[in-house]
């Protein structure tokens, strides 16, 4: 990934991590969630911040299977930026994935019942994705992913971080890892861990 503010190192990254000993990179890139997605640092619609999506095509060195993965972080303020950003992202996933199995991850700053997430998962939309939580037969952990370093009461914590899949990926396990050591937090979000095949 690259920094969202300048396309180099400045600002937040929406990086993708992979095991180099397991996968070869076939192609990769990034685009901004804006009206000008190829312009580095462009801010979209009513967004408060620049937002970026990073993607990669990987080949498994063991099975030779290929996969497409994308990671993003939708705007926390602009509703239009989230809606338009997700439409752009779905178009790009469709265009770039070449029919490969797809994994999309990120902080969508949207709860499951929001119009943004409904658009992503709407089966009437040919570009739709499947929520890994809904697809998994094994689900563990809480139903929330954002806690603001423990400041939000348990019953008010929202689920805003997602893993979506498409094109034949089977979700074996889905979990939100909410355990902390000595009440310490590494982030204001909890990790979402998904096992697919």
Where are these regions (language model features)?
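Structured beta-strand-rich core segments of catalytic domains in phosphoester-bond hydrolases
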Residues: 1-66, 176
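Short histidine/acidic/glycine/proline-rich micro-motifs that form metal-
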Residues: 5-8, 75-77, 109-111
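A generic secondary-structure signal
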Residues: 59, 88-95
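Active-site metal-binding loops of divalent metal-dependent hydrolases
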Residues: 72-74, 106-108, 190
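Hydrophobic pocket-lining residues within nucleotide cofactor-binding pockets
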Residues: 33, 72-74, 169
């Amino acid at each position: 990934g690259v920094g969202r503010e300048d396309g180099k190192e400045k600002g937040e990254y929406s990086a993708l991590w992979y095991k180099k000993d397991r996968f070869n990179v076939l192609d990769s890139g990034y685009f901004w969630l804006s009206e000008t997605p190829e312009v580095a640092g462009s801010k979209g619609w009513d967004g408060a911040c620049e937002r970026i999506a990073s993607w990669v095509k990987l080949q498994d060195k063991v099975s030779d299977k290929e996969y497409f993965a994308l990671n993003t972080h939708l705007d926390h303020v602009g509703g239009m930026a989230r809606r338009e950003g997700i439409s752009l992202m779905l178009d790009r996933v469709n265009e770039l994935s070449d029919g490969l199995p797809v994994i999309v991850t990120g902080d969508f700053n949207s709860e499951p019942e929001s119009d943004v997430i409904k658009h992503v998962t709407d089966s009437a939309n040919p570009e739709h994705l499947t929520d890994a939580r809904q697809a998994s037969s094994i689900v563990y952990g809480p139903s929330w992913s954002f806690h603001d370093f423990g400041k939000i009461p348990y019953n008010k914590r929202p689920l805003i971080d997602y893993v979506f899949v498409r094109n034949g990926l089977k979700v074996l396990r889905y979990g939100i890892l909410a355990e902390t050591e000595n009440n310490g937090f590494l982030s204001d979000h909890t990790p979402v861990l998904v096992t697919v095949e």
